[in-house]
Amino acid sequence: MWGAWADRWLKRFAARHGLNEARPPEIQCLSSHCVGKRFLHVGCGYSRKQQTVPGFQSDDWHEIRLDANADVQPDIVASMTDMSMVPDGLLDAVFSSHNIEHLYLEQAGTALTEFHRVLADNGFLVITCPDMQAVAALIANDHLDETAYVSPAGPVTPFDIVYGMQSLLVAPEYYMAHRSCFTLRTLIAAVRKAGFTECYGIRRPEQFDLWLLAHKQGLSKEALERLAQDFIPN
């Protein structure tokens, strides 16, 4: 049923964006004729699936890139809080890396609900964001403006982790600011509130990040942990 809906949507999408019948393969993967598994790379920036996690990098997975910034040439230009152009239950997975913290807390809840909506019943979410518990430990010891680690964009301080990378926050890039934060407990709570039933999460204090795998319909603890081996880094 959703396949026919997706085919109609593809025609509207192609007309709106000037695409001909030789659609990009990523967009074609929204149709009912796509073979293989599909994951939505939310807030992708310039990254491709090779920059995600090993589980998504195999040929078994088709990547669909979504970003609000048209300059990064995503397959779909949209906000993660409104993905209404993506049919319900279409996708096998959603990957969200370091973008939920750019939303206010209420917006983050909306985004998580959207992630849940577009997933098939056996689909899952992989999400990562800063670990505020690890950052708070540095701040409590008066290291607010000292380098916590060095990223490809340069040195990162606890201040950058909390509020957004200051070297990038220049007009018109103010949307790069951070507006919410999570510990592992509060991230799990937010994901469950959005409708996900089972979660497997870890803290990586030395990397100052959280990783969470959430299944839409529910798996046994053992099955969830096996799945996490390919999609959650050590």
Residue ranges of model-derived segments:
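Conserved long hydrophobic alpha-helices within structured protein cores
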Residues: S31-G45, S151-F159
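S-adenosyl-L-methionine-dependent methyltransferase catalytic module, highlighting the catalytic core
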Residues: Q107-T110, E114, A120, F124-N234
